Amino acid sequence: MKKGIHPEMKLVTVKCACGAEHTFYTTVDNIRIDVCSKCHPFYTSGGKGGVLIVDTEGRVEKFRRKYGDNY
């Protein structure tokens, strides 16, 4: 590898909207994500059909106010 042409890798803590933190090596300083493996429905349902909804912007509540719970 040539010296001086590669970006510097640093250990960064990635924060999810659910509060979970993951640590990665990356060239980016700050990373925030909306969904991770601790809160994504694919990983959290456990095959039992349960669904966990992560709504950081209130879209679900807006939909329920507009159409009600019997959509």
From Swiss-Prot:
InterPro entries (alphabetical): Ribosomal_bL28/bL31-like_sf, Ribosomal_bL31, Ribosomal_bL31_A, Ribosomal_bL31_sf
What Gene3D superfamilies does the entry give?
Ribosomal protein L31 (4.10.830.30)
Residues binding Zn(2+), per UniProt = C16, C18, C36, C39
Whichever gene encodes this chain, its name is rpmE
What Pfam family is a match for this entry? Ribosomal_L31
- Subunit record text: Part of the 50S ribosomal subunit.
Recorded GO terms, molecular function? metal ion binding; rRNA binding; structural constituent of ribosome
Q: What is this protein called?
A: Large ribosomal subunit protein bL31
Asked if the record carries the keyword Ribosomal protein, the reply is: yes
Q: Name one GO cellular component term.
A: ribosome
Q: Please list the GO biological process terms of this entry.
A: translation
UniProt cofactor(s): Zn(2+)
